[in-house]
């Protein structure tokens, strides 16, 4: 694993995320393809999401093809991975006392619609 990959997904983050990743089922096709490492896929997705890089320009250095990365992103999104990961990170930071909830901001807006108007 190269330096960029370790900066994007440090071992501590991967330890939190790995148990949350849904099981992978191979696609039925002739000959099949070699399974791709979940950490490599996760790292490629993090790169796309944090860099603003378009999916189609995902560097091959991650060892993941664009279709594989996007397919897993879609599957993991439908499975609720990102919400569960966010909660796991908050739980871990909270357990370490690294979140100062006294400075949290809650924002909400409510505007009453006039009767008969959209």
What name fits each language-model region?
Residues 1-118:
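Short alpha-helical elements
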């Amino acid at each position: 694993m190269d330096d960029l990959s370790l900066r994007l997904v440090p071992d501590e983050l991967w330890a939190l995320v790995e148990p949350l990743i849904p099981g992978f089922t191979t696609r039925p096709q002739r000959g099949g393809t070699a399974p791709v490492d979940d950490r490599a896929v996760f790292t490629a997705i993090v790169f796309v999401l944090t860099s603003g890089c378009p999916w189609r320009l995902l560097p091959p250095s991650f060892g993941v093809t664009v279709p594989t990365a996007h397919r897993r992103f879609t599957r993991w999104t439908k499975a609720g991975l990102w919400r569960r990961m966010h909660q796991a990170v908050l739980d871990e930071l909270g357990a370490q006392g690294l979140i100062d909830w006294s400075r949290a901001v809650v924002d909400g807006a409510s505007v009453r619609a006039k009767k008969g108007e959209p």
